Regions:
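Active-site beta-strand/loop signature of hydrolases that rely on acidic residues for catalysis
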Residues: 17, 39, 99-105, 338
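Class I S-adenosyl-L-methionine
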Residues: 45-52, 62, 66-276
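N-terminal Rossmann-like NAD(P) cofactor-binding module of classical short-chain dehydrogenase/reductase
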Residues: 54-56
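C-terminal target-recognition/interaction regions appended to catalytic cores
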Residues: 212-367
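Short loop/turn segments at strand-loop or loop-helix junctions that form parts
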Residues: 58-60
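Short acidic, glycine/proline-rich loop/turn micro-motifs
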Residues: 6, 66-70, 296-299, 330
């Protein structure tokens, strides 16, 4: 999905994923000329073609996310950064230096192991001659989807970075408190190699959640009354009150529900259905258990309907085009988008930072 966001200005020469199901969707849309389905740890520098301007790495978030096990870069999944960077070091040793490196992950990467994982990533980049900066970009600025993600953008020291791409100091909204804290933990030599990237703030209209919801969805069915009643029975008084207020509006209101484990008034952990009507979807997650799949609730006065979020709705919340092919199986589709990148977020980063950096490189060479 990074390729979708980068757009036609960038030509993809190599793509890698370990998941056959994701690869099938990629092939259906892009073809498979540059796709290699393989564990990144088994790739060799000779497998990567040419002299890349940009290398993009999105490594699994499970060991870094708030819902993960806290293993950080030592975990089996998020630990794929290490073989990825070993591969990049091999490419660099061959004199094929990527001019720009982008690493994407959950914001938990900033605090994992008290910030030591983030420091290790920055140090790895700086040791290979890169200047490094980072941004926290939330999909909610582009789509009705709360999905903050960390983007580490590194540029090789050979590139003269245009001044308009740099902030003199940290600034909102891209440089959040957690990012500033992580930066503050860096040793001085790494701070010396740091760049506070500048990005404009998007001001295009954001579609409402209701506008993305299908009345006749494909891949899911509306719940029975008993199933909907069960979801309502899991709501706390606070969330029941939200539901009641939506009913009093006497019009079609769309909300979403995630199930979460919360302590009750006696301190006992129980499952709760938490509903929101702010026209923002909760962050899509990979479908590990029923509670990780988001439920759509449509309220029309006394009538309340519910069902799982459909595959096409998940694709829309990630900004994928309508013609993007969906996996046949529900969980495969939900996994594809729950583990993916939000297309307009990548597009904004590409148009306002990555492409200008690439142009600066070409201008420098021409000069």
């Amino acid at each position: 999905m990074a390729r979708l966001g980068l757009g036609p200005a960038w030509r993809c020469t190599f793509s890698n994923d370990i998941c056959d199901r994701k690869a099938a969707s990629y092939r259906a849309y892009f073809g498979d000329a540059e796709l290699r389905v393989e564990d990144v740890a088994r790739l060799k520098p000779k497998d990567l073609p040419g002299n890349p301007t940009l290398v993009w790495g999105s490594f699994p978030c499970q060991d870094l996310s708030l819902a993960g096990n806290g293993a950080g870069l030592d975990g089996d999944r998020s630990g794929t950064f290490n073989p990825f960077w070993k591969l990049m070091r091999g490419v660099i040793r061959l004199g094929r230096i990527p001019q720009i490196v982008v690493l994407e992950n959950v914001v938990g990467a900033l605090t994992s192991h008290d910030g030591r994982d983030f420091t290790a990533i920055v140090d790895a980049l700086v040791q290979e001659g890169y200047r490094v900066g980072a941004l926290v970009m939330d999909a909610v600025r582009f789509l009705p989807h709360s999905r903050p993600r960390l983007f580490i953008v590194a540029v090789h020291q050979e590139i003269a970075v245009p001044s308009q791409l740099v902030c003199p100091d940290m600034s909102e909204p891209w440089h959040t408190t957690s990012l500033r804290t992580a930066y503050g933990r860096l040793p001085e030599p790494l701070k010396d190699a740091w760049i506070w990237w500048r990005l404009p703030i998007p001001n295009d209209p954001i579609p409402s959640l209701a506008s993305l919801i299908e009345e006749e969805p494909t891949g899911v069915e509306w719940h029975t009354k008993e199933q909907t009643d069960h979801i309502i029975s899991l709501m706390s008084p606070l969330h029941l009150e939200k539901l009641k207020k939506a009913q009093l509006l006497q019009k079609r209101v769309v909300g979403t529900v995630y199930r979460r484990v919360r302590p009750n008034e006696d301190g006992v952990k129980v499952q709760r259905a938490e509903i929101r009507f702010d026209q923002i979807s909760g962050c899509l997650r990979t479908p590990v258990g029923g509670s990780s799949r988001q439920t759509v609730v449509v309220v029309e006065g006394r009538r309340i309907r519910s069902r799982l979020l459909s595959p096409r709705e998940a694709a829309r919340l990630m900004g994928a085009p309508e013609e993007y092919p969906l996996p046949i199986k529900y969980n495969d589709a939900y996994h594809l988008f729950g583990d993916g990148l939000v297309v307009p977020v990548v597009g904004w980063l590409s148009a306002n930072l990555l492409t200008p950096l690439a142009i600066a490189r070409r201008v420098m060479i021409a000069a």
